[in-house]
C-alpha cells in the first residue's frame, strides 16, 4: 500500500450560511456567463498539469464523506468568521489546509478568536473564491484501499485559479493526479452536485447532463466509472428555485443506507420537486446492501419567514460536512436551528454535532 493514510479527503466544505454574498458568489456572474465558452475551449487546447488525461489503470473507489480522513481544504477569502469556526472544530479532528495568499493575516484572525494553528497548514497558491467544496479535488483509491489518488474535474465556473487548486493539492500530497480535462474524458462537474456511498453509487442532479451537452448520459456514466468507480449513477431533475442546482442544498447521505432529505411546507418553493425526486429514488433504487433507503426529513428553513419562491434566500441544513467524529451543520440563528441539530444528533449517535 502507499499513500492510504495521507489526505483521505482533499476537498471541502463551506456552507451558504449568510445571505449577503461577498467576493465571487457561488453562482456565475453575468460576466462569467459570457466567459464560460472560452474557458471551456481552453481545455481542448492544453492540460492543466501537462500530463495525459487518462483514467487510472486499476479499478477506482471514491470514498464516502463519512470515512476516516486526515485533512480538509478551505479557501480563505470570504466569510472569515464562519471559516474560523470551521477551523476551530475541524482541527481537533484532522489537519486543516487553508488556501490563502496572506498567511499572516489568516493567523492573526484565527488568533483573535482564540484559534491557534496547531494542525493547520497553509497553501500558498492562487485561487478565486471561497467555494472549495465545489472546485476542490476528490480523493479516491485504486484497488479499493490501495493507493490514494486525486481526481480533478473541469470546474463549472470560469475561475481558472480555483480550477488549478486540485493540481496544487495533489502536488503537496504527492498523490497521482487524474484529470477529466481532455477529450474523450472531458467532464464539467462540481463538488456540491455529487455525493457517493463509497461502494460505487453516486448521486447528482441533472445539472451534470446540462453542463456536458456534447456527452450522452452513457458517456458521462462511463467517465465517472473509469475515474471514480461510480457504477450506479443516480440523477434527479433540478429544482426550480435552487439557482445552482447542487444536490447538497437539499440532500445528504448519512451512511450507505440513509438519506437526509430537506422538506418544505407542502406545496412551497422546491418542495414538490424534492418530493418527486425522493419518490423516484426510493421507488427505483435500494441501498448497496439491498435494503430500502431509510429516509430522514429535515426542515428547509425560512429566511425571516420567507422561502425562495418569494423573497427568501436559499437556506438549508443539508449542506453539512462530516469530519471524522464531528459533523458541522450550518445554522442561521433562527428557531429551526435547534430542531435541525436535534435531527442530526438523533440520526448520528456518537458524533459531535
Report each predicted region and the residues it spans.
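The feature marks the mature, well-folded catalytic cores of soluble enzymes
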Residues: 21-353
Amino acid at each position: 500500500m502507499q499513500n492510504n493514510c495521507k489526505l483521505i479527503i482533499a476537498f471541502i466544505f463551506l456552507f451558504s450560511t449568510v445571505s449577503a454574498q461577498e467576493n465571487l458568489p457561488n453562482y456565475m456572474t453575468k460576466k462569467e456567463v459570457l466567459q464560460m465558452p472560452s474557458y471551456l475551449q481552453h481545455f481542448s487546447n492544453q492540460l492543466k498539469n501537462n500530463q495525459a488525461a487518462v483514467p487510472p489503470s486499476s479499478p477506482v473507489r471514491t470514498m464516502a464523506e463519512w470515512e476516516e480522513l486526515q485533512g480538509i481544504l478551505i479557501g480563505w477569502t470570504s466569510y472569515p468568521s464562519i471559516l474560523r469556526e470551521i477551523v476551530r472544530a475541524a482541527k481537533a479532528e484532522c489537519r486543516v489546509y487553508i488556501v490563502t495568499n496572506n498567511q499572516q493575516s489568516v493567523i492573526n484572525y484565527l488568533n483573535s478568536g482564540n484559534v491557534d494553528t496547531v494542525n493547520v497548514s497553509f497553501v500558498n497558491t492562487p485561487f478565486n473564491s471561497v467555494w472549495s467544496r465545489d472546485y476542490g479535488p476528490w480523493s479516491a483509491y485504486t484497488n479499493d484501499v490501495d493507493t490514494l489518488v486525486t481526481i480533478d474535474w473541469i470546474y463549472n465556473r470560469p475561475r481558472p485559479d480555483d480550477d488549478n487548486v486540485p493540481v496544487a493539492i495533489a502536488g503537496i500530497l504527492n498523490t497521482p493526479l487524474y484529470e477529466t480535462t481532455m477529450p474523450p474524458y472531458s467532464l464539467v462537474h462540481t463538488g456540491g452536485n455529487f455525493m457517493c456511498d463509497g461502494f460505487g453509487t453516486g448521486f447528482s442532479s441533472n445539472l451534470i447532463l446540462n453542463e456536458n451537452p456534447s456527452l450522452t448520459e452513457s458517456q458521462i456514466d462511463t467517465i465517472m466509472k473509469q475515474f471514480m468507480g461510480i457504477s450506479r449513477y443516480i440523477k434527479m431533475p433540478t429544482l426550480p428555485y435552487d439557482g445552482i442546482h447542487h444536490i447538497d442544498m437539499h440532500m445528504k447521505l448519512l451512511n450507505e443506507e440513509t438519506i437526509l432529505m430537506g422538506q418544505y411546507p407542502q406545496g412551497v418553493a422546491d418542495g414538490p420537486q424534492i418530493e418527486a425526486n425522493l419518490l423516484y429514488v426510493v421507488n427505483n433504487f435500494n441501498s448497496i446492501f439491498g435494503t430500502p433507503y431509510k429516509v430522514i426529513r429535515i426542515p428547509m428553513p425560512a429566511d425571516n419567514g420567507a422561502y425562495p419562491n418569494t423573497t427568501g434566500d436559499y437556506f438549508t441544513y443539508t449542506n453539512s460536512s462530516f469530519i471524522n467524529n464531528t459533523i458541522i451543520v450550518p445554522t442561521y440563528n433562527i428557531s429551526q436551528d435547534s430542531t435541525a441539530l436535534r435531527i442530526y444528533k438523533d440520526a448520528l449517535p456518537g458524533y459531535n454535532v
